[in-house]
């Protein structure tokens, strides 16, 4: 058949019709054009897998049958599903993912798409958010331990995509630039739909899910570079995140225990119930000034127990070889090593 424009268009519409009935695998470029229903995924524990230690990232779902490799299942079942966490969030293809998972759990054909979690190499939970917004001094005792005023409204700063890091990864300490490296366990909000000037009462409906994160920090750069925070917190690899995102329907974000351990020793132990600005206030407040987009993430502040909060003669800063473990109740334990 001659590849006239008309034939190509006709071919695309046949593909779309077949896809709508679940009859054919749809390439991503084609899927972008499909009228898939928009919405967030529900009832799922999600992760990013990486293959061959490369930036070949794929969406995974933790199930009772193991980790479902979403792209592999979509191919086996010949139905569309978003292939990466960023595709899921930014295209708002939650319903397609829920359909795929429900089908895969009962279809014999999808069996090869389940893998053992022990064999999975984790990638950064998200890899291309449009924004990473961070809230500082959001726990009273942490504000007090650092000698700061307890803020009346959330104190905002930012990180960048190049900060993103993964569960079981490493943070390379830039020892030529800084010496005072510190941990900050934090709950991370993952945004699921566009939020602009949203009222507090509705704010939680804009969250796709929640994850464990660490707002890793070089204190000397944070406090000794002219009174601005970003440079101490936006260094490459300084935003470990993961291993999982739990969908928002599974989590009460304002009532989660959180902990940080260094080489097995507990350093931080608190609850998100102690946050000054709760989750709905943070989303609402940020959305007054900055339009939040699906796939954006928000670091929500750390509780007391950081090295900066100790008396000066007891401050032993982190060093290469230290192993950090951060956990949030239900959301999983994030581990990484300093090199
Ligand atoms: Mg922080």
Predicted regions span which residues?
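Short, structured patches in soluble enzyme cores that scaffold and shape functional sites
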Residues: 50, 137, 159-161, 168, ...
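N-terminal export leaders
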Residues: 5-21
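Structural signature of FAD isoalloxazine-binding scaffolds in flavoprotein oxidoreductases
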Residues: 148-167, 183, 320-329
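A generic local secondary-structure boundary/capping motif
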Residues: 34-37, 47-49, 122-124, 144-147, ...
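N-terminal non-catalytic cap/leader segment that marks the start of a structured domain
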Residues: 5, 12, 28-154, 323
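Secretory targeting signals
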Residues: 1-3
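Short acidic-glycine loop/turn motifs at beta-strand connectors
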Residues: 61-66, 191-193, 263-264, 328-330
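Catalytic-pocket segment enriched in acidic/His residues
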Residues: 34-36, 217-339
